[in-house]
Design a protein with these regions (language model features):
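Active-site-proximal beta-strand/loop segments in catalytic clefts of secreted hydrolases
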Residues: 42-46, 85, 91-95, 118-121, ...
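Active-site scaffold of zinc-dependent metalloenzymes
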Residues: 99-129, 167, 173
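Extracellular/periplasmic catalytic domains that process cell-envelope and extracellular macromolecules
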Residues: 31-34, 82-84, 104-111, 126-127, ...
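Disordered inhibitory propeptide/activation segment of secreted metzincin zinc metalloprotease zymogens
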Residues: 15-72, 103-109, 183, 188, ...
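Bacterial N-terminal signal peptides
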Residues: 5-14
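Surface-exposed patches in mature extracellular/periplasmic domains of secreted proteins
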Residues: 70-86, 146-157
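The catalytic-center signature of Zn2+-dependent metalloproteases
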Residues: 126-201
């Protein structure tokens, strides 16, 4: 039987929170460049036994795929390296919840940032591809999206159909075929690249 593909709003993509102190403008200190970004990817302590057993493999798969995914998402304008001493920490949390970018301050100044990526959505254990998209989305929040036409760090307009371009919507429009994992946007749009200061090759 031919698989039927349809659009849906994925909760895992819409479960995105950025702390209020990131509003109303982008964070600038310490300076992080989307052109040369480094990420420390690590495993958190949360999760049931099955998910904890899955986390090392998820970490390794995401670490292997994220540099290429970032280069593709930025149209070749950005480079990403996986390092222990990195610009930003990304934690894989083995529970359900709201994936989010959090900034940590000392004396009113930003000293570090952390992203929590939850690997479970309801009863579903998310795939590497889904977690990659979530990670790209949360990394995008370092710079995007602010000002007119945005709400809570996302574009306020809603896509009318699926497109692989445009990562900074909430909820995010994805497609899914029967028996397959969802396919979601993987490329930053021109206006997202502009927010990230990546408008020139």
């Amino acid at each position: 039987m031919k698989a039927i593909t349809f659009a849906l709003m994925l909760v895992f993509a819409s479960s995105c929170g950025v702390i209020a102190s990131l509003r109303p403008g982008p964070t600038i200190a310490p300076l992080i460049s989307a052109r040369f970004l480094s990420v420390h990817l690590f495993i958190g302590d949360n999760g049931d036994a099955q998910e904890k057993a899955r986390l090392p493999g998820l970490r390794d798969s995401i670490a292997g795929a994220l540099p290429t995914a970032w280069a593709t998402a930025t149209g070749g304008r950005g480079q990403l390296a996986i390092r222990t001493d990195a610009d930003i920490d990304v934690e894989l949390d083995g529970t359900g919840g709201t994936s989010a970018l959090t900034q940590h301050k000392l004396g009113g100044k930003i000293v570090s940032r952390t992203i929590a990526v939850h690997t479970v959505e309801g009863s579903r254990r998310l795939s590497v591809a889904e977690l990659l998209v979530t990670t790209l989305h949360e990394l995008g929040h370092i710079w995007c999206c602010f000002g007119p036409g945005t709400k809570d760090g996302h574009w306020s307009d809603t896509p009318t159909s699926f497109s692989s371009v445009g990562l900074m919507y909430s909820p995010m429009t994805c497609t899914v075929a029967a028996g397959s994992d969802p396919v979601c946007p993987t490329i930053f749009s021109d206006r997202e690249l502009a927010e990230m200061h990546l408008t020139a090759p």
